[in-house]
């Protein structure tokens, strides 16, 4: 082809690719804005919402002309430029006025710190809570709050480690490094046990009565060894047909056998396994596990070790300002565009009428904010805090949609955002974290034979309750300063005062077969617990006087439990088949699943009431995740085989999440939004099972509606909070013990023909106890003094005398039911188990708020309870 013909073809192609429409024409015409936009005098288009909002968004200020002048409210601070910001934003270390006048030194140096606050120095405008002084963290921007603090002095019953840390004297010479520097185990004499004690191989001492009782109390199990007892320990646990029993006694799902991931405590599920190979459609991770091949190089870490995302090639190589993608698909360097050389097959890199033309000179290219001229064409861009909504117009970015952008409260502003803290918290300007005001928060956790506490600031590490048997679950009533825990060996729930130096504790609830977790309702003063043996969830008053099953069906392996009495909901995890997390009203109504997918072994759950989220640990997936309280907006916080080897329980406070790992025998902490800032708080634990944060802000105060108008809400037995679904939801309902139903008045209880008792099949004799209410709720052993009552059987003559009267009553009731059915045969209705929910003609869900009595809260029908004694026998 000749040179002239080649150039003719080049011109023809260039004309074909030339743009046929442009927002800004060469003649200088202004582009017309859409109906949802405002056109500035200079021709630019901005969103209509920005008209007369106090900010000049048009470069010529025309969007703020002819606007009604706004006046600031009394609760606002007036900036020098006339802008209004809330008074609480003044002198908070964050400029909110566009001119920065809310943070001017003249204004802020005049500021006086409030009661319980201290100044960060004469040259600082910052005030911090008194409790933050000498807490080990720099809260003042100049660090003055951590100066001249002196050495920490340990109390008389504490030991001072070489590092200056305080630990309980009981931890000295116990064979464990509790100081983390080994100083508590220096110069220790050989340990000796008392005459009535047995010395474990680890040198610790246990009562002689605990030896050879088929319950390993020594951490090395030497009290149940073959050499000591002459036999192997008898394992009483019977696993369901869908599970297998580990050598260490616990049950796991059959499908977890030989899957490459040890799930038994002793690893026996991975012994004598054939060599594992992945299927052809699977990818083998470096740790040997298999994932579906489609998950490799998908941008998500599906392998725990992340090996599925290693050496992945970027499919789209045409990213960045230095690249140009041809319309025919090739990717070339931007330097080759408009160089009069064909680099794209279709010549799209050499458009004749677009090369080196600055479209931004006319009407800013139609861009509302920034116009960037390119070698070919142009592109619109936005200032920080804004994003393109239609390729030309900029709109505000809602930064509050990003998890963790604020510690607690996020307020979206035009072009930015503002972080605030909930009541009881204050912003730490050094970190941006909302820190609790008041006493030092601490972690309290079980350690099998004792309960321990570690401060989260000064790291003081002490023993709260000692000489326990097998503590597996823990919670607290913080306002009452009481601890509650469940002991697996003693099959009971106990309580103790957290400040009781004598170490006394009391049995509150007996006959708890296999407690998995407990949760204290600090508002209505009840306690909820899951029982892995009876497959039930129960509730009782804190003194144990009244109790009942809340759920005793559709539970396979109930595990962790958490309550939110402010909204009336209870949450629990179940690792049976299928594994799930559920929620329901704390009165037993409105039960529904929360998490049902991508979940296998949900061991621990906890609630973040400040951010309205639920966090859980999956011991099989080695993952920490969260959802909102409706089961939406699921996020993976951390996935780690190292730090989540076998996590058991977790708790949350401020911006940190803390958990116990059974395999590593340690307590860890991490950022609750990102999983970063991993830290080890405690090591060398002995079968730790549960953990809580102890601080008054963990349990926010709420109104006990059961004590609003009359005692116990007028209920004969239990008064339980109802789920607050909407503004018309009842505040509470009455509930009866097992074997009883509510009468029509919604307050009193009547007996059914099949009463339920809490008798145990082994080593426990139960007694029916007559309560002052006249109810017999089953064999409940409590610490309060009660009288044993025997009820003689009624004579047969009395039964024959009542029989004719009973037949007449049944005939009358039958006739009434037939008449009512005839009367309502044409009425269109929908019947539910809970009759307060009715179907309306508008297809909306409405709630009937009728009361049975003026003295009682709204009522639900009675819950039918079925005995589980046969299942437990």
Swiss-Prot record:
Q: How does it sit in the membrane?
A: Single-pass type I membrane protein
N-terminal signal peptide: 1-27
Keywords of this entry: Cholesterol metabolism, Coated pit, Disulfide bond, EGF-like domain, Endocytosis, Glycoprotein, Isopeptide bond, Lipid metabolism, Lipid transport, Membrane, Receptor, Repeat, Signal, Steroid metabolism, Sterol metabolism, Transmembrane, Transmembrane helix, Transport, Ubl conjugation, VLDL
Q: Which residues lie on this side of the membrane: Cytoplasmic?
A: 820-873
Where are glycans found on this sequence? Answer: 151, 765, 781
Regarding tissue, the record states: Abundant in heart and muscle; less in kidney, brain, ovary, testis, lung and adipose tissue. Strongly expressed in neurons.
Name the residues that span the membrane. 798-819
Q: What name goes with this protein? A: Very low-density lipoprotein receptor
Quote the gene name from the UniProt entry.
Vldlr
């Amino acid at each position: 082809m000749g040179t002239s013909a080649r150039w003719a073809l080049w011109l023809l192609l260039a004309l074909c690719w030339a743009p046929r429409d442009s927002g800004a024409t060469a003649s200088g015409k202004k582009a017309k804005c859409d109906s949802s936009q405002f056109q500035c005098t200079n021709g630019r288009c901005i969103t209509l919402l920005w008209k007369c909002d106090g900010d000049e968004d048009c470069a010529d200020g025309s969007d703020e002309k002819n606007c009604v002048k706004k006046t600031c409210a009394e609760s606002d601070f007036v900036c020098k430029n006339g802008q209004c910001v809330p008074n609480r934003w003044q002198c908070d270390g964050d400029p909110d006025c566009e001119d920065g006048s809310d943070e001017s030194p003249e204004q802020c140096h005049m500021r006086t710190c409030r009661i319980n606050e201290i100044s960060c120095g004469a040259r600082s405008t910052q005030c911090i809570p008194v409790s933050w002084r000498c807490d080990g963290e720099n809260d003042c921007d100049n660090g003055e709050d951590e100066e001249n603090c002196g050495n920490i002095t340990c109390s008389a019953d504490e030991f001072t480690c070489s590092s200056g840390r305080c630990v309980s004297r009981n931890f000295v010479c116990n064979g464990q490094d509790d100081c983390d520097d080994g100083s508590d185990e220096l110069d220790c004499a050989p340990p000796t046990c008392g005459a009535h004690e047995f010395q474990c191989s680890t040198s610790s001492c246990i009562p002689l009565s605990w030896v050879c009782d088929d319950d390993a109390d020594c951490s090395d199990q030497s009290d149940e060894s073959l050499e000591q007892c002459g036999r192997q320990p008898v394992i009483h646990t019977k696993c369901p047909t869908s599970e297998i029993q580990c050598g260490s006694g616990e049950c796991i799902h059959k499908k977890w056998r030989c899957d490459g991931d040890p799930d038994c405590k002793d690893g026996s599920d991975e012994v004598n396994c054939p060599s594992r190979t992945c299927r052809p459609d699977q990818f083998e991770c470096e740790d040997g596990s298999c994932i579906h091949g489609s998950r490799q190089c998908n941008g998500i870490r599906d392998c725990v070790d992340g090996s599925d995302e290693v050496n992945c090639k970027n499919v789209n190589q045409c990213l960045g300002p230095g690249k140009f993608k041809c319309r025919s698909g090739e990717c070339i360097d931007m330097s080759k565009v408009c160089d009069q050389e064909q680099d794209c097959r279709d010549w799209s890199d050499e458009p004749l009428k677009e090369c080196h033309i600055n479209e931004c000179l006319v009407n800013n290219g139609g861009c509302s904010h920034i116009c960037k001229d390119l070698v070919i064409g142009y592109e619109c861009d936005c200032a920080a805090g804004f994003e393109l909504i239609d390729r030309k117009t900029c709109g505000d970015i809602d930064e509050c949609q990003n998890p963790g952008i604020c510690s607690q409260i996020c307020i979206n502003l035009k072009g930015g955002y503002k972080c605030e803290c909930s009541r009881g918290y204050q912003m730490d300007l050094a970190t941006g974290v909302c820190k609790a005001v008041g006493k030092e928060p601490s972690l309290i956790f079980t350690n099998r034979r004792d309960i321990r506490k570690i401060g989260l600031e000064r790291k003081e590490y002490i023993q709260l309750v000692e000489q326990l048997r097998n503590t597996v679950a823990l919670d607290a009533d913080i306002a009452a300063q009481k601890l509650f825990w469940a002991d697996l060996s003693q099959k009971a729930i106990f309580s103790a005062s957290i400040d009781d130096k004598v170490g006394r504790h009391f049995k509150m609830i007996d006959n708890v077969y296999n407690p998995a977790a407990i949760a204290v309702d600090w508002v209505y003063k009840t306690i909820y617990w899951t029982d892995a043996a009876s497959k039930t969830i129960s509730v009782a008053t804190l003194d144990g006087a009244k109790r009942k099953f809340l759920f005793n069906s559709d539970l396979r392996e109930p595990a962790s439990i958490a309550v939110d009495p402010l909204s009336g909901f209870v949450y629990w995890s179940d690792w049976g088949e299928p594994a799930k997390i559920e929620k329901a009203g704390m009165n037993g109504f409105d039960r529904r699943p929360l998490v049902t997918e991508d979940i296998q072994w949900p061991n621990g759950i906890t609630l973040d009431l400040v951010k309205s989220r639920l966090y859980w640990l999956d011991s099989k997936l080695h993952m920490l995740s969260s959802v909102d309280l409706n089961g939406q907006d699921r996020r993976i916080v951390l996935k780690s085989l190292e730090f989540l080897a076998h996590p058991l329980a977790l708790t949350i406070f401020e911006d940190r999440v803390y958990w116990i790992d059974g395999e590593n025998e340690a307590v860890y902490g991490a950022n609750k939004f990102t999983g970063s800032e991993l830290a080890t708080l405690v090591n060398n634990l002995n079968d730790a099972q549960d953990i809580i944060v102890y601080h008054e802000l963990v349990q926010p105060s709420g109104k006990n509606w059961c004590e609003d108008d009359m005692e116990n809400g007028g209920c004969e037995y239990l008064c339980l909070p109802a789920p607050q679904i909407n503004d018309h939801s009842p505040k509470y309902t009455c509930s009866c013990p097992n074997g009883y139903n509510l009468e029509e008045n919604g307050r009193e209880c009547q007996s059914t023909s099949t009463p339920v008792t809490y008798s145990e099949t082994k080593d426990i004799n139960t007694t029916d106890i007559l309560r002052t209410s006249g109810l017999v709720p089953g064999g409940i052993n409590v610490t309060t003094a009660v009288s044993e009552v025997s009820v003689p059987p009624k004579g047969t003559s009395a039964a024959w005398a009542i029989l004719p009267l009973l037949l007449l009553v049944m005939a009358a009731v039958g006739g009434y039911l037939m008449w009512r059915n005839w009367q309502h045969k044409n009425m269109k209705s929908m019947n539910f188990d809970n009759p307060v929910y009715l179907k309306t003609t508008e297809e909306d869900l409405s709630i009937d708020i009728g009361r049975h009595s003026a003295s009682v809260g709204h009522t639900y029908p009675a819950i039918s309870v079925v005995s589980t004694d046969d299942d437990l026998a």
